[in-house]
């Protein structure tokens, strides 16, 4: 769930249990690593044997790889689908988020440097879409896997943050239309992007898994690079600053910086990371 200035109680369908673990910050493997791995030895099926590149967190202000570069790295060692219901959403690309995606309380650099890169321009399996987003925005891929499990169990059709405010309902999702009389969901998709704060990404946020993940981690990067200065103008548990990867994970849920709600969410994501919940047999939904 993406919150810019408001803390709300979230209700997510389906209900998810907690979260992940600590991840070291490191430089992502260069394209040459994937290229040499994919090349392999002559006459062999190298793509099947190549070890996938692991995408690590890149420091604030780092030069990030392009979406096209990340697509090549991911597609060099593609991984299978574990969420069959996502296939229609995984086949759809995203859209531009427009000129006013980030709030006026953010540094103008967020809109200038981050927003134009949010496009959802990728298709693939669910895990490959998450790998692509991790690569593109320079965040440790296991953090992404764990957070997406907390938010939606990796299910793009997840609906959350139900409310009664008709103005907060996206087009096509009027009050009562999605199964709860007098309510509509405000958060959608694999990362539970929230319509009132990210309306520039609609309707692709709902229809495209790649768009949902791309926007979520574009916002994470804006936070990590120090652009979300409004976090120091609202109640907080500490002073917001650049470079706190986990603080920016907690901000996604709580809309505040290292408050009790944010810390509780961070603990959930870290639990799933420790467990590597996405590798468990019961996590797979193949049909």
Protein language model regions, located:
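Secretory targeting and sorting signals
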Residues: 1-34, 38
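Poly-acidic low-complexity segments
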Residues: 2-4, 10, 14, 140, ...
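A sequence-level detector of short, solvent-exposed, charge-rich linear segments
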Residues: 27, 31, 163-167, 284
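N-terminal active-site wall of soluble small-molecule enzyme domains
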Residues: 126
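Short, functionally critical alpha-helical segments immediately adjacent to catalytic or ligand/cofactor-binding
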Residues: 129-131, 136-175, 193, 216, ...
């Amino acid at each position: 769930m993406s919150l810019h200035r408001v803390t709300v109680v979230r209700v997510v369908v389906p209900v998810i249990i907690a979260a992940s673990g600590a991840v070291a910050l490191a430089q992502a493997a260069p394209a040459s690593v994937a290229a040499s791995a994919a090349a392999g030895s002559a006459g062999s099926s190298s793509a099947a044997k190549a070890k996938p590149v692991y995408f690590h967190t890149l420091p604030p202000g780092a030069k990030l790889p392009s979406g096209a570069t990340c697509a090549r790295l991911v597609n060099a060692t593609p991984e299978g689908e574990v969420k069959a219901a996502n296939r229609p959403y995984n086949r759809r690309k995203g859209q531009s988020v427009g000129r006013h995606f980030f709030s006026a309380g953010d540094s103008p650099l967020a809109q200038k440097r981050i927003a134009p890169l949010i496009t959802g321009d990728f298709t693939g399996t669910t895990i490959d879409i998450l790998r692509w987003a991790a690569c593109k925005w320079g965040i440790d891929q296991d953090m992404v896997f764990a957070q997406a499990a907390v938010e939606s169990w990796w299910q793009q059709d997840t609906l959350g943050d139900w409310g009664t405010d008709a103005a907060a309902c996206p087009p096509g999702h009027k009050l009562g239309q999605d199964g709860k009389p007098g309510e509509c969901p405000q958060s959608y998709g694999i990362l539970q992007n929230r319509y009132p704060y990210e309306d520039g990404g609609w309707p692709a946020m709902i229809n495209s898994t790649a768009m949902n993940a791309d926007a979520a981690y574009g916002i994470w990067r804006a936070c990590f690079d120090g652009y979300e200065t409004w976090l120091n103008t609202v109640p907080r548990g500490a002073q917001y600053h650049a470079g706190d990867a986990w603080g920016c994970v907690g901000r996604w849920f709580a809309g505040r910086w290292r408050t009790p709600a944010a810390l509780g969410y961070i603990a959930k994501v870290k639990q799933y990371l420790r467990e590597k919940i996405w590798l468990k047999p019961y996590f797979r939904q193949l049909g």
